[in-house]
Amino acid sequence: MDGRVQLIKALLALPIRPATRRWRNPIPFPETFDGDTDRLPEFIVQTGSYMFVDENTFSSDALKVTFLITRLTGPALQWVIPYIKKESPLLNDYRGFLAEMKRVFGWEEDEDF
């Protein structure tokens, strides 16, 4: 019994740390993009909004492009594989990567985003 009392006293003597809450992004997690041109604007808005509110996580162009790549599937994922294999500079250029996506997946030039 003495051991228990000592243990309880020792535990009670420990400083109480406030629970650290993990920050949760208020923007819904972006859906995947498979190369459907009609869904490209929606994909860009979803991923851009998600990254915008979490600037600490997405602090560089490389991290932003990497995140976009994780949301690609099907033909869109197949499209990006050669860029990864040759370590394309576009992987470190968020705006350049978006411009290339728009070009490849048929974004009309007069549409500004």
From Swiss-Prot:
Superkingdom of the source species: Eukaryota
General remark: RTL8C is one of at least 11 genes called Mar or Mart related to long terminal repeat retrotransposons. They do not correspond to functional retrotransposons, but rather to neofunctionalized retrotransposons genes.
Family: Belongs to the FAM127 family.
Protein's name according to its UniProt entry: Retrotransposon Gag-like protein 8C
Organism: Homo sapiens (Human)
